[in-house]
């Protein structure tokens, strides 16, 4: 996973480079392939500085918690076999992704900086708000699936991907994951023009690298979960042996879409971000959820 995260940073820089008519990293190694390793070495051998006024334990614990949670979410994911086949796999994913808010809040509070605290409060409000729609979307999918276990989703989608009947949910989930992972155009927590670097402004060296790894691991996990929920995960009728490769290709395509959006769109204003959720996404997801509750009840009289 960490290797995938390392090369995702390289792919991002390459894609953004080509979109802006330049090469991207091309000095370290052939075609710049060793750039992530060089970045990691540079960050981890630097001295981890911290402000004198910061709260030392919380300051150090926040990045460790962020990375630990980002790697813990992978436990119940079927790829094609999960590490632990949990009965309530989806609830586990939802609860662990909700806990990631604490690492951001701790880092902003412990830094003892106005910029960091403002960025952290924005991040918390944004993440908690979008968690609501993500939870309702997961509930709707579970109503179709009939179980909270992630592995049963492959059986559900054996004949048709769930993206076909539930495409509004897929679109709202994709945009919500952009906001959940603090990516452009919703990267208000790291608004360079106004907050320098957001909640991690006081971090350097190793702890900063841990936040960086956690952010990109979250991007991959969110896209992997979207693939499992809507795109039949690893199911390919004519090539069942290539299950993991198929799953990885779909995840990579969604991740590339993340990067494409980053290169194309400017940053949202904060009130627009909240209006988009509370006035647009929440009604859409609630109505769709009610529809999936009513449909089986309405059709239950048919023998």
Curated annotation (Swiss-Prot):
Record's bilayer topology term: Multi-pass membrane protein
A molecular-function term among this protein's GO annotations: NADH dehydrogenase (ubiquinone) activity
Keywords annotated in UniProt: Electron transport, Membrane, Mitochondrion, Mitochondrion inner membrane, NAD, Respiratory chain, Translocase, Transmembrane, Transmembrane helix, Transport, Ubiquinone
Main location, first listed in the record: mitochondrion
Annotated GO biological process: mitochondrial electron transport, NADH to ubiquinone; mitochondrial respiratory chain complex I assembly
Cell compartments where the protein resides: Mitochondrion inner membrane
Class of the enzyme per the UniProt entry, highest EC level: translocase
Domain of life the protein comes from: Eukaryota
EC number from the UniProt entry: 7.1.1.2
Gene Ontology CC annotations of this record: mitochondrial inner membrane
UniProt entry tagged with the keyword Translocase: yes
Transmembrane portions of the chain: 56-76, 88-108, 132-152, 159-179, 219-239, 241-261, 282-302
Keyword Transport: yes
Function (record text): Core subunit of the mitochondrial membrane respiratory chain NADH dehydrogenase (Complex I) which catalyzes electron transfer from NADH through the respiratory chain, using ubiquinone as an electron acceptor. Essential for the catalytic activity and assembly of complex I.
Family the UniProt entry places it in: Belongs to the complex I subunit 1 family.
Complex formation: Core subunit of respiratory chain NADH dehydrogenase (Complex I) which is composed of 45 different subunits.
Protein name: NADH-ubiquinone oxidoreductase chain 1
Native source species: Zaglossus bruijni
